[in-house]
Amino acid sequence: MKNQICLVLAFSASLFLSHQSVAKEKDSAFVPFYFSTETLGSTIGLAGVAKGVGQPQAALFGMGLYSEKDSYVGFLSAFNYALSSNLLFSTQMYQARFNDNPYYLGDQGSNGSSTEDKTITNGDEENYKLEFKFLLPWGNVCEHGLLGAFQPIRDVSFASPVESGVSSIIFTPFYSSRELDIYNDKKEEATGFSLTFDWDNRDSVRNTTRGSHTSFDLTTGAESLQSEDLWLKWEFQNSQYYSLGPLGDWFDQQVLAFDFYTADTPTWNQCDGTVCSRPPEQEQVRLGGLYRLRGYTAGRYHGRSAIHYSAEYRVLPDWQPLDDIPLINYYDLPWWQWVAFVEVGRVADNYDLKTLHEDMKWNVGGAVRFQVEGIVVRAEMAKGADEGTFRVMINQPF
């Protein structure tokens, strides 16, 4: 398990909290934790969340950890502060130091690279984001106003964003940097912004049975605000969910979930001498981690473009023993879910559909997911051709 998982866990928390309802769950929680991995060694940390801070739909989240290798991660965030009846503000701040950490640099992250071909070095990482989310007056927001964006159960009878779901335009200025010792402390920096159209037409964020979720994202940036070497990246993602109903006395619910993702960097080959309009590696199109090619390390593959497919079979078993287990039954655990999934995808240095569908990487896996105090916790194992992972995290992958 790579140390970057801790960062992505925090981002997963932000994705989930952005859809929280004003609910009956606990207003705050703080959890100390300990784990040990090959890259970090023995590690201790503390994570906490507070809901309804200042406004009923708002939330604060923070996490910090420190390892025996003197590596550390710090993450702070605030979500869903209403600046007006249709404008929400969120922010995320992340800093980390990783010592003796594996990185897949340059061609080490290409589709044809070997898992054993990696660079071990020390690295400092930073990432800061401001998010301004404008809720379009369509669908659920038109009918229910601001609270329509936070309803836990929605009617998704229509296949148009004007009539159904929650549609938004999101403007996100950002700054990120990575400084590796192997590069003699030269920083790889990116300053820019992304513009996203998002249509969330799922009947439930936590346990989706019907509907869809679609987003299109444009990101542009450069090394600094004064730089003329602007790069441009676009990403498209679409998820679809189909209910199969119950299965006798075995399963109360069956769902087929599919996800499609593709991305490209059109400025990749716009070069002036040795300088090309390309994002630094931490901002490139990436596969591997918590959401795509989950059998591989976070950011294992990166480059100009990518395509990725996921399919999941999700069931809620009729057998529910969790309420009878001491200590565990202290928490609100309304359901648990069994999942089988398969994924294929690849990166490439050109956006060519034929190339992107050749020599694709794959993994298969299984997961058990729980809703705990309103938060979806997932434990999953995935295995690819040359790598495998086991992770415990929060939030549905899509």
Question: How would you describe each model-predicted region?
Answer:
Residues A50-G52, N80-A82, F134-L136, W199-N201, ...:
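Residue-level signature of outer-membrane beta-barrel architecture
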